[in-house]
Amino acid sequence: EDGQATIKARDIAKAAWTGHNIPHDFGIGLEETEFYHPVDMSSPYGAHIAVVEIDRETGDVDLKRYLAVDDCGVIINPLLARGQVHGGLAQGIGQALYETAALDADGCPTAEPSIPRSDMLPRFETDHTVSPSNTNPLGVKGIGEAGAVGAPPAIANAIIDALWPLGVKEVDMPFTPERVLNAIEEAVSRDAKKVTAR
């Protein structure tokens, strides 16, 4: 009508994925695969523990404590290393509890992204161990992603541990009050049906 054509993002993705709907004389693009195997890679590691309290009536998850011990090899600047961990923890906690990417039928976001504010986070209890890397002269390892990688599974495990006695075996991220409450209600309903069926 107005000279413009539109197509939904999901239709583009579907056509690119399946490929059989594309005309035979139309190329579907380029593909390239490459693997990089660095000889001097170092692997940081750590242990993360989350302590949560869950309101059974609302599904609200309150992160009470967060403990993390990470090894990033020789620490050159302790303040920057701590800042990297704290920033990563905030990012990982946001992924676990708040951030969602809901789209409407046209592929547009339905809400603003929700990220945690500092008043929504507990005081982080962090420490470091030092095991120097033998793959570089400084003995350093990475620390930038430690918090972001460790936080989601630590929070997931804490939530499932808290809800396990109710029969909840899994909840999808992010662990919003609605999702947690739905998981609780489904587990309680399932248990009630088991009792009735006996």
Question: Where do the model's predicted regions map?
Answer:
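C-terminal catalytic domains of large/alpha subunits in multi-subunit enzymes
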Residues: 1-198
